[in-house]
Amino acid sequence: MKPGDLAKKSKLTMLELRYLPFWLVPLTATSTYEGMLERISPAIIRKGTIQNEYDWLVLGRKAAEFPTREYRVPTEGKILFDFTKIEGQAKFLSSELDSDEAVIRAKDEVEENQRFLLKQEVDQVTQFDTSFTVEKPTYVHAPLWFVRYEYKGKSYSAIIDGSTGSMIRADIPQTDFKLI
């Protein structure tokens, strides 16, 4: 819960519009597994398949961090690229990944996600294999506002979707709870 005086007592220290490059990689992941379910007694050997379709978002920068799992590229605001419509003060970042590198990164991240989902089925994995069907990746730039503000002497940050105005991620100061 945010403090009640956050809007009044916070001070904006940075507001920057950046167009970040993303690769949207549509793919289907099919994972076959074998493992032990040990939550019940006696332990049971389980075999199965986990299949999911993804529109996996990959940030087109190598060293940058961005909460891609929390962000959904808004499809309704998608327009053909026109450099003349970029705001003058905005930072426009190009991709450091080509489409093949984006697909490799998407496959790695999706396989990790499939392994995470597998933990709901078995406790101990003895065999795991994933195959992919990948469609053509789409290269997009998304307008994002990066915000930094101060509240009671501490610095906080936020990221806002420039297309929809929705909050993607924000650091919120802790509220002081007092017992009466």
Predicted regions mapped to residue ranges:
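Hydrophobic "anchor" residues
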Residues: 155, 166-167
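Charged, low-complexity helical/coil segments in non-catalytic cytosolic or luminal regions
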Residues: 1-155, 172-180
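A charge-rich, low-complexity, intrinsically flexible signal that marks solvent-exposed coils, linkers
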Residues: 160-162
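Short, surface-exposed beta-strand-loop junctions and turns on beta-sheet-rich folds
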Residues: 164-166, 175
